[in-house]
């Protein structure tokens, strides 16, 4: 998509959106994808989906409270990603893991960064 995927796949300060709750949740999504890469089983996949869905709910709640202008299109991107990851089964193929990593990196830096200072 555009931004480089970090190796090892870990959150770093370049992903900071400056809302502690959201930064902590982004870290947790990174960790959950990393966990699937290293222990490609149904439990880790379920945790990845749950952590991601919970984060999206929290982030969307903050956006809604702030009357964030791009809420609808942002929410749609979340929904589309959830459809993909909820459709996965373990073991997850390398192509799908790459997709999840790429999506997260580019979503945070390309989309989430647009709400910095607006929530």
From Swiss-Prot:
PROSITE patterns xref list: HEMERYTHRINS
Binding site for Fe cation 2: 59, 74, 78, 107, 112
SUPFAM superfamilies: Hemerythrin-like
Pfam family, one: Hemerythrin
GO MF term set: iron ion binding; oxygen carrier activity
PANTHER family (alphabetical): BACTERIOHEMERYTHRIN
Function: Hemerythrin is a respiratory protein in blood cells of certain marine worms. The oxygen-binding site in each chain contains two iron atoms.
UniProt-recorded name of the protein: Hemerythrin
Origin species: Paraleonnates uschakovi
